Amino acid sequence: PIPVADNHMVVAVPAGNPGEITGPHDLRRDDLRLAVCAAGVPCGDTTAARFGDLPADTEELSVRAVLSRLVLGEADLGVVYATDVAAEERVVVPWAQEQACPCVVYAAVALSDRGVGFVEFLASQTAQAILADHGFSTR
């Protein structure tokens, strides 16, 4: 397998940042509503591994549900994948966040001769630029 891209968890807020979130210390503010994924689902386990035990106001069964809470204004901040922020213009990352793991690594492998060209394309600068445009960390 050839790793072609990574995805990592980031703190996101509704566009305009109404809660005036400026850094990781805001994850523990009592006056803000924090949405995360629940323990036992991949995004929840990854969130806990990256940020530790957070005082969440809501624990969702999917990252899409966390994203919905942000979009609807039901949460002031939430932890989602970087690609979710790139795909949803109604949320933003409120401060520069390093691409820290644990992260999801996407790898490709050719199972036949016909797949070799596709795997080579995924590793190309063209494909890497497309992946980066969609929020993935590239290799």
Give the positions of each predicted feature:
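Exported/periplasmic ABC-transporter solute-binding proteins
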Residues: 2-139
